[in-house]
Amino acid sequence: MAIDENKQKALAAALGQIEKQFGKGSIMRLGEDRSMDVETISTGSLSLDIALGAGGLPMGRIVEIYGPESSGKTTLTLQVIAAAQLEGKTCAFIDAEHALDPIYARKLGVDIDNLLCSQPDTGEQALEICDALARSGAVDVIVVDSVAALTPKAEIEGEIGDSHMGLAARMMSQAMRKLAGNLKQSNTLLIFINQIRMKIGVMFGNPETTTGGNALKFYASVRLDIRRIGAVKEGENVVGSETRVKVVKNKIAAPFKQAEFQILYGEGINFYGELVDLGVKEKLIEKAGAWYSYKGEKIGQGKANATAWLKDNPETAKEIEKKVRELLLSNPNSTPDFSVDDSEGVAETNEDF
């Protein structure tokens, strides 16, 4: 429908005045805004990248990863950092828990010599550091480990036993308002790791809650619930964890999908194992009995041998990965069955700890 000529002139004058006052690009038609094309970074897990619908975690946004203890939260964020560094991006790790193991990070592929690391004294200091890094425009990925460890200054200066109702929630709420715009302008990905607490007296529904108030839940573009669902064994020895991640919230694609993968101790996410499974599922890799073949060439007897072959042949692995991504990301209807029936079992966010 054509707009009245006088209205068009008035609109053009108004847009010109806004751009003159606030700068070029302060207002534009949505179709002209090329920054709306979401750039993503791989999570290190192929099935999780596909479950997210965009091929990874979105740049310029806030992401929350939460789950029980020893579920793989920090491992997943370190894999994101490793993937980002491979693309030449600069990463920072805000270690509020004072528990980052550089030796483990190196084993996961993180270049620790070029990883910025801070161990802040207070929650306010941690969030101010995040804001300063985002405003610099020079840092691409920031990880905060964890929201539960972001202790307000008043609580640190007070005594154990003092009541500080809602302090952390107010601190996070103020930080989210300040950070969201700066992250978008600098195209910086900010990942918050969060812990789970139990609500007292819940008779029906899920008693789980995440710490730090409601603001993070609203401002996060992606929320991931990560759980350990089993053990990976070699004979009698436990060598890793079977892990399930649910996409609880997703502003860039359809939510409530899930991915399952293995986290191997000392190695991280078993990417090549996922590649074998998804390759077979999409008929890119042929499986006859225990033998796996690719383009008529046998690559191994048993999944472990096929995985080892792909690890030794990275060019073939990249070729299969590219085909899997093209098949599953270009056509959402062909996505493997990662769906969750509903949002039951998703942790809510409480006002305080």
Swiss-Prot record:
Gene Ontology biological process terms from the UniProt entry: DNA recombination; DNA repair; SOS response
Q: Segment Disordered: which positions?
A: 330-353
What's the main place this protein lives?
cytoplasm
- Keyword Lyase included in the entry's annotation: no
Signal peptide stretch: none
Matching entries from SUPFAM superfamilies are given as: P-loop containing nucleoside triphosphate hydrolases (SSF52540), RecA protein, C-terminal domain (SSF54752)
**Is this entry keyworded DNA repair?**
yes
Query: Any idea which positions bind ATP?
Result: 67-74
Subcellular compartments: Cytoplasm
Q: Which GO terms describe its cellular component?
A: cytosol
Q: List keywords of the entry alphabetically.
A: ATP-binding, Cytoplasm, DNA damage, DNA recombination, DNA repair, DNA-binding, Nucleotide-binding, SOS response
Compositional bias per record (Acidic residues), positions renumbered to this chain: 339-353
This entry's Gene Ontology molecular function terms read: ATP binding; ATP hydrolysis activity; ATP-dependent DNA damage sensor activity; damaged DNA binding; single-stranded DNA binding
InterPro entries for the chain: AAA+_ATPase, DNA_recomb/repair_RecA, DNA_recomb/repair_RecA_CS, P-loop_NTPase, RecA-like_C, RecA-like_N, RecA_ATP-bd, RecA_C_sf
Q: Which family does it belong to?
A: Belongs to the RecA family.
Q: Which NCBIfam families match?
A: tigrfam_recA (TIGR02012)
PANTHER family hit by this protein: MITOCHONDRIAL DNA REPAIR PROTEIN RECA HOMOLOG-RELATED (PTHR45900:SF1), RECA (PTHR45900)
| Function summary | Can catalyze the hydrolysis of ATP in the presence of single-stranded DNA, the ATP-dependent uptake of single-stranded DNA by duplex DNA, and the ATP-dependent hybridization of homologous single-stranded DNAs. It interacts with LexA causing its activation and leading to its autocatalytic cleavage.
Know the name of this protein? Protein RecA
Species this chain originates from? Shigella sonnei
- Gene symbol here is recA
